[in-house]
């Protein structure tokens, strides 16, 4: 969708891809496509410095991160900005506050907004965190602190599965975002996922697009967004 809009506006597009994605539609649709590395994301889509060097070599004006990988990485955003490349997304400061779920929880807590019971810091000792998980009560949701796209998230139904699922979540978060930090929360089954989307540009114009019903998901990733939500009152 981003490239389609760019083409309608007469803006040339460049796609980066791993060897595994060389025949995908977005690669063929772009005006130019550059292979950034082999299939593992740690050797391709997470190589921020390499991606920025490609931008410089091709005189790219702006970079759109898509979702997952480096899309919520404040360090990458700052490096792009410092290199004179427009990052199409939040500022590094905003990303530091909200791109990391633990930092976001800390920010939200200051406003007295209710949150699901859980821990507010990255887990460094898996065995000790099992004690906390038992206090919260199963099922437990293990969540990667960085990134999005449903990566690094595991539902743990019982204590016997906790250590294994924690280690799997840490490994997935590390390979997907380059950051293996995870935390735990009480798992809420069949919740309503409601978002209010806010858009702002560099000129200070801000608009909200009302609420969106995002409860239909697959692997903790939204499949359909419906606006307005049919369950909320005006």
Language model regions located:
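N-terminal beta-alpha lobe that positions the nucleotide/phosphoryl donor
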Residues: 1-234
């Amino acid at each position: 969708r981003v490239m389609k809009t760019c083409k309608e506006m007469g803006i040339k597009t460049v796609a980066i891809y791993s060897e595994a994605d060389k025949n995908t539609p977005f690669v063929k649709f772009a005006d130019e496509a550059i292979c950034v590395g082999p299939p593992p994301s740690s050797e391709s889509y997470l190589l921020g410095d390499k991606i920025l060097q490609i931008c410089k070599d091709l005189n790219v004006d702006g970079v759109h991160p898509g979702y997952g990988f480096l899309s919520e990485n404040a360090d990458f955003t700052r490096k792009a900005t410092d290199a004179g490349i427009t990052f199409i997304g939040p500022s590094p400061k905003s990303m530091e506050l909200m791109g990391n779920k633990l930092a976001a929880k800390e920010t939200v807590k200051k406003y007295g907004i209710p949150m699901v019971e859980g821990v507010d810091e990255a887990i460094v000792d898996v065995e000790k965190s099992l004690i906390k998980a038992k206090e919260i009560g199963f099922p437990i949701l293990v969540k990667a602190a960085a990134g999005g796209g449903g990566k690094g998230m595991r539902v743990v139904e019982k204590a016997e599965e906790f250590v294994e699922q924690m280690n799997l979540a840490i490994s997935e978060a590390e390979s997907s975002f380059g950051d293996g930090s995870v935390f735990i929360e009480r798992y809420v089954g069949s919740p309503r996922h409601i978002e209010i989307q806010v858009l702002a540009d560099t000129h200070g114009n801000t608009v909200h697009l009302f609420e969106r019903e995002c409860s239909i998901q697959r692997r903790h990733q939204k499949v359909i967004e419906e606006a307005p939500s049919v369950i909320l009152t005006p």
